[in-house]
């Protein structure tokens, strides 16, 4: 694996068409890192064409991340070849159809902080101990070339993936980066409020529904909720109206691990997992082809939801009981 050590601009200085993308169902870190990188490259390479491709994302991110309004939600034209393609906060198998254009690019750059990523680019910058992709992108940038827009995009991503600096991956480097970015004068408190704490009425109702329908397993240490399309249709909810539910579930007293699964479309389910101490949810998610971090992970389920939940429950229960010194029956 070629580790990215030089200035990223050196790797793409001769490129005329550069693509940027991240994982499916993009969150603030994914959108923030992609938009910040695009602004940075456009500033340094005004003659190059820089395109960001992502699935649609929360409107709050459009309002809080400069450049998010120009992200493309379509795909490049068939047969189009990029001089360079940058995969941020992701690996190609989590990028959806756009991964083909990453694979065919002359220069492939992968920047990620997920522990399950071993690097998939011509050049890679992978650090599973970093708080966010935005923290890694910040490390690769020339501080003198960061402006207010880039700073706000990076800060928003860091805030999102650290849960406002509360998750264990938050470190000294994270706080130093955030402190430097705050010097650019954007309204950081408004970003935290809008991106992390505010809920729409539909989101609030779906959170209430999820909490009411949750099961408590393993003496209350494992909280599980499954919502189908009928549950969502009752309030006209879409995927974006379910943001933050697993993070709220794991805050319940006595809970170490929370799993929230919802039916995204007929036969396709998405599971979001959170842990605070014992359970390695990245390990659990990997059993179904997903990934993430020790304390936050997820997966897409295209097989029987009953069988998939059985696999997840068995692994989580096994981890909890192993910590107690008991074998899983």
What are these regions (language model features)?
Residues 27:
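Polar, low-complexity loop segments and adjacent catalytic/binding residues used for recognizing
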Residues 2-24, 32-63, 73, 77-82, ...:
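Hydrophobic helix-and-loop "lid/oligomerization" segment in the mid-to-C-terminal part
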Residues 30-31, 62, 95-98, 120, ...:
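Short glycine-/acidic-enriched loop or helix-start segments at secondary-structure transitions
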Residues 111-177:
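Short alpha-helices
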Residues 67-71, 104, 126-129, 276-277:
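Short, hinge-like loop/turn segments at secondary-structure boundaries
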Residues 70-123:
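Active-site cofactor/cluster-binding pocket
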Residues 77-80, 100-103, 117-118, 146-147, ...:
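Solvent-exposed alpha-helices and their adjacent loops that cap or buttress functional pockets
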Residues 37-38, 102-105, 126-127, 176:
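Glycine-rich, phosphate-binding/catalytic loops in enzymes
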């Amino acid at each position: 694996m070629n580790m990215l050590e030089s200035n990223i601009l050196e790797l793409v200085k001769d490129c005329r068409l550069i693509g940027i993308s991240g994982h499916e169902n993009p969150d603030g870190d994914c959108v923030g890192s992609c938009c910040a990188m695009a602004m940075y490259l456009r500033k340094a390479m005004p003659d190059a064409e820089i395109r960001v491709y992502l699935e649609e994302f929360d409107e709050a991110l459009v309002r809080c991340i400069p450049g998010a309004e120009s992200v493309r939600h379509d795909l490049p034209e068939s047969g189009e070849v990029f001089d360079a393609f940058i995969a941020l906060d992701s690996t190609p198998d989590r990028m959806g159809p756009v991964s083909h254009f990453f694979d065919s690019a002359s220069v492939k750059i992968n920047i990620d902080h997920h522990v399950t990523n071993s690097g998939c680019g011509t050049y890679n910058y992978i650090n599973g101990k970093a708080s966010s992709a935005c923290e890694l992108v910040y490390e690769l940038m020339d501080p003198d070339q960061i402006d207010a827009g880039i700073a706000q995009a990076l800060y928003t991503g860091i805030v999102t993936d650290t849960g406002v600096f509360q998750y264990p991956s938050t470190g000294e480097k994270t706080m130093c980066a955030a402190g430097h970015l705050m010097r650019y004068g954007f309204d950081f408190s408004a970003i935290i409020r809008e991106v992390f704490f505010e809920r729409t009425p539909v989101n609030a109702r779906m959170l209430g529904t999820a909490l009411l329908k949750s099961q408590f397993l393993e003496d209350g240490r494992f909280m599980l909720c499954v919502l189908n399309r009928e549950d969502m249709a009752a309030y006209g909810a879409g995927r974006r109206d379910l943001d933050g539910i697993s993070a709220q579930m794991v805050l319940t007293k006595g809970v170490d691990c929370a799993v929230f699964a919802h039916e995204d479309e007929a036969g396709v389910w998405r599971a979001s997992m959170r842990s605070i101490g014992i359970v390695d949810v990245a390990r659990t998610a990997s059993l179904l082809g997903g990934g993430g971090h020790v304390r936050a992970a997820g997966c897409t389920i295209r097989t029987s939801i009953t069988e998939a939940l059985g696999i997840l429950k068995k692994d989580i229960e096994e981890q909890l009981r192993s910590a107690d010194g008991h074998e899983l029956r």
